[in-house]
């Protein structure tokens, strides 16, 4: 793993590297190896984060605003973009017509990371990342339904994470993680769809998930 950053932000760059390595190790244990043997983190004059195969950008504002704490966008987005090496890099999806599929998985993967490595911050994650934005709407939305980023993020990323959490609460942890592993193994190197994901989820449990699914995708 290589971290590319401006000299003035060396402390934050090292932190971004540390969070990324921790996330790589955690996700590798949960989901298997990432698609590439290397990963580059690049500080960029960019508004947020952006994933690529074996590479991601982090906004320079995350570096300049970093206070040394895991309660930060630098940590959150480093973990999020690392998760894309699985939910994008290994299992693809239609990022225009079904943008929630990889983004919700990566957003929820942030929580999984914090639960594992900093469990005392799980409640903080919900209170900082999701709840203040009161996400709502149907996950059937496409990118063409949005003219601004904030409503898009609130629905696709945050409402999507709430949906995954609802599934997990109904299924239980063992079935939920089994569903994620099945989904990844079944569609590794392919473009998956909502139906593919929901099939893997439903096959992992005998619990009735119809209410959560209907609520998430209601017109």
Describe the function of each predicted region.
Residues 17, 21-24, 55, 79-80, ...:
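Extracytoplasmic/secreted envelope proteins and their assembly/folding machinery
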Residues 9, 121, 153-219:
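Amphipathic alpha-helical substructures
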Residues 33-42, 94-98, 120-124, 178-179, ...:
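Surface-exposed patches in mature extracellular/periplasmic domains of secreted proteins
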Residues 99, 103-171, 187, 216-217:
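Acidic/His/Gly-enriched intrinsically disordered linker/tail segments
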Residues 1-85, 89-98, 150:
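Juxtacatalytic substrate-recognition/specificity segment
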Residues 15, 19, 40, 123-129, ...:
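Extended, well-ordered alpha-helical scaffold segments
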Residues 28-31, 81-82, 86, 90, ...:
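Sec/Tat-exported extracytoplasmic proteins
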Residues 20, 51, 71, 75, ...:
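Active-site-proximal structural scaffolding
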């Amino acid at each position: 793993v290589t971290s590319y950053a401006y000299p003035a932000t060396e402390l934050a760059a090292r932190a971004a590297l540390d969070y990324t390595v921790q996330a790589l190790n955690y996700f590798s244990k949960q989901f298997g190896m990432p698609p590439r043997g290397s990963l580059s983190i690049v500080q960029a004059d960019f508004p947020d984060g952006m994933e690529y195969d074996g590479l991601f950008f982090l906004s320079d504002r995350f570096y300049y605003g970093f206070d040394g704490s895991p309660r930060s966008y630098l940590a959150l987005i480093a973990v999020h973009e690392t998760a894309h090496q699985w939910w994008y890099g290994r299992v693809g999806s239609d990022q225009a017509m079904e943008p929630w599929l990889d983004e919700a998985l990566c957003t929820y993967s942030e929580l999984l990371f914090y639960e594992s490595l900093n469990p005392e911050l799980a409640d903080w994650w919900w209170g900082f990342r999701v709840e203040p934005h009161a996400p709502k709407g149907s996950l059937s939305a496409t990118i063409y339904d949005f003219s601004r980023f904030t409503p898009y993020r609130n629905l696709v990323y945050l409402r999507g994470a709430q949906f995954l959490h609802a599934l997990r609460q109904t299924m239980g942890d063992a079935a939920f993680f089994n569903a994620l592993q099945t989904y990844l193994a079944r569609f590794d190197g392919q473009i998956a769809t909502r139906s593919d994901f929901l099939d893997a989820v439903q096959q992992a449990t005998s619990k009735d998930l119809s209410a959560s699914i209907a609520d998430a995708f209601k017109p």
